[in-house]
Amino acid sequence: MPQRLKQVYQDTIVPKLTEQFSYKNPHEVPKVVKITVNRGLGEASQNAKALESSINELSTITGQKPVVTRAKKAIAGFKIRQGMPVGVMVTLRSDRMYAFLDRLINLALPRIRDFRGISAKSFDGRGNYSLGIREQLIFPEIDYDTIDQIRGMDVSIITTAQTDEEGRALLKELGMPFRT
């Protein structure tokens, strides 16, 4: 079953962006390639339960099992040895990516307290967008009673856009609520 957002992209966004940026080839139109959801855990090296709950929460939110990221180097100031778990990460592509993006735009972001839109300045110069989420409770899949601590996550949306202007136009057409 094709994702709703993917269908909208193919039917309406591609022709609109082709006209706006006067692309000659339909493959020039920017598209979302992947979404990475990352959560760094400072206390994971001492607390295995925090790591386990983060894995469960991210797999519930994204629908895919996260990978445990480990420290590359030992850092004495942070009491971290090489190979210790320091976070969890999920890379979403294809249908799961579109499903997650749809839920993020239409369900999760509007549930943020005092939400007035997201910053349009978080582009990296190559059309990719990064967004920090302060608490996992904005996702409807997370049950308030089952969480042990409020933790945030970083969401990076990687596109094939060459410039920030193209990336912004793509995400705006997908429904991303940018602050005006």
UniProtKB/Swiss-Prot annotation:
One annotated GO biological process: translation
InterPro entries in alphabetical order: Ribosomal_uL5 (IPR002132), Ribosomal_uL5_bac-type (IPR020930), Ribosomal_uL5_C (IPR031309), Ribosomal_uL5_CS (IPR020929), Ribosomal_uL5_dom_sf (IPR022803), Ribosomal_uL5_N (IPR031310)
One GO cellular component term: ribosome
Keywords: Ribonucleoprotein, Ribosomal protein, RNA-binding, rRNA-binding, tRNA-binding
Coiled-coil blocks: none
Superkingdom per UniProt: Bacteria
Recorded GO MF terms: rRNA binding; structural constituent of ribosome; tRNA binding
Family: Belongs to the universal ribosomal protein uL5 family.
Protein's job: This is one of the proteins that bind and probably mediate the attachment of the 5S RNA into the large ribosomal subunit, where it forms part of the central protuberance. In the 70S ribosome it contacts protein S13 of the 30S subunit (bridge B1b), connecting the 2 subunits; this bridge is implicated in subunit movement. Contacts the P site tRNA; the 5S rRNA and some of its associated proteins might help stabilize positioning of ribosome-bound tRNAs.
Quaternary data: Part of the 50S ribosomal subunit; part of the 5S rRNA/L5/L18/L25 subcomplex. Contacts the 5S rRNA and the P site tRNA. Forms a bridge to the 30S subunit in the 70S ribosome.
Entry protein name: Large ribosomal subunit protein uL5
The organism of origin for this protein: Rippkaea orientalis (strain PCC 8801 / RF-1)
